[in-house]
Structures are given as structure tokens and as C-alpha cells.
Amino acid sequence: MEKRKTNPHLSRKRNFQFDGVINMKSLMALKRNKPFTKAVSNMAVMDITDIKPLFTSVYKLLEDNGVFVFATQHPCFVTLTEKYMTPHSYYDIAIEGQPQKQCYYHRSLQDIFNLCFDTGFVIDGFYEECYFNKEIPDIIIVRAIKIER
């Protein structure tokens, strides 16, 4: 069996610290000689204070027709709130036994989708995953395509 070659750009050691703030300069440091074809954000959108820098950076780093897939808590069912339309933060437990609650950021579906559209993405896939109750989705998974402006 042939040994896989390691991409030195991807294999170099990185130290990440995260405080809920996305720094566009740090994200753009991921830029390489050619644009990326795909980008994935798995269960991070709800942990970020302002997601606009994330979406803008991903858009800039992707090639035309590149794919951005992201998953996040379902804003309609996970964060049952009287303030669905108002972006806000709240604290909750992610994993039983964790030492303290963590901060989450709630956004409505229209806020998330409109940010995609305003950034230049077209949504061509939307999925709702159910884990605990087969009729109440916990997660949304969005597939967005970068359209040349």
C-alpha cells in the first residue's frame, strides 16, 4: 500500500484559541495559491458572536461554485424562547458533566439565510436532523454555493 503524501500546509501545527469572536485576518491566513473547492463548519455557528466574518472569509477563500456546508443547532426547536426573532446569547450545557455552562448565540433562520444571500451564497441544500425525537429536529445542515458576483 502506498503511503499518502502529507500536505505541509495542512499538517503544520496550529494553536487555536476561541472566545466566540472570529477574526477575519486569522481566517484569511488560511489562503493558499488556489481557492478552496469546499469548506465545512461543523456545529460552530452557534458558538460565534458575529458570524459575518466567517461567512465573508469562506466566500473569499472558495472558488466560484465552491461549496460551503455548515451545521448548527436548529434555531426553531433547540432554543425555545420568546425572543426567536431577536439575536441573543444564552448559557447551557453541551455535554453532561462539563464544569460550567457555555455561551451560545441564537439567530433566526431568516438571519442565517439572509447572511448567506447577502454574502453571495445560494442555498441549494437544507436538511434537518433529528436525534432525540424523530419529529423535532435538533440540527440544521445548510449547503451553500458561492456564486460569482
Language-model regions, residue ranges each:
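Conserved SAM-binding strand-loop segment of SAM-dependent methyltransferases
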Residues: 15-29
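Conserved class I S-adenosyl-L-methionine
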Residues: 67-96
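A short glycine-rich, Lys/Arg-flanked "PGG" loop and its adjoining helix->strand segment in the class I
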Residues: 52-67
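Conserved SAM/SAH-binding beta-strand->alpha-helix loop
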Residues: 3-4
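Core SAM-dependent methyltransferase catalytic element
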Residues: 119-121, 129, 134-149
